[in-house]
């Protein structure tokens, strides 16, 4: 049987593909290459270029491969852009995901691992944030992910879809051949490195009134190698008939 990985040509998805292959899994990747890179996909994976909401294409993949589970990385993920273009975020991240889910369910693929985000929480009411923290996103990006979470919960109740929704905090780092290649780059750590290398004039860190020793912000980062392994653990959990879960992914510090 095979694992369908949507967004498998992206930053985190490509790392998960490599780790799945390393465990002897058969991997089928579906990516539209809007933000992903074909070269990032391990040559041992089976690759399809297209949209997750293309029901005909998804059905073709399911007809040609015995899919056991889906790891769903595919999403637009820029908070600022989501404010400027909320329509494409709700369409791609929510509507297209529902189309994907419906085809999977029609074919009895009922194991689903979802890349969610800490952005579903919005402004923290307390820290550290746990999975019981109230959710009220502050951006269309966060809302688009939150809406998928609500759909997953309802699909479990109605259709017995079993899922693990992993709420990432701040992904960073590189794993073997897999790393960041965003254009334009928006992640903090690469921007700091660009400034150190003289590739940009400076880096501005905003905010000086946070409740921290020096007033600046503290962020929780998690390495993509750890994120990838968390997805493999989620897959094993579902294979053992584990219950659906929402899980924060961070290191608990800053």
What are these regions (language model features)?
Residues 1-171:
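N-terminal Rossmann-like NAD(P)+-binding domain of SDR-like oxidoreductases, especially those catalyzing
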Residues 126, 202-203, 246:
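A residue-level signal for beta-strand positions that form part of recognition/binding surfaces
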Residues 153-233, 253:
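NAD(P)-dependent short-chain dehydrogenase/reductase
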Residues 243:
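Short, small/polar-rich loop/turn modules that mediate ligand/substrate recognition or access, typified
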Residues 249:
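Conserved metal-phosphate-binding beta-hairpin within the catalytic cores
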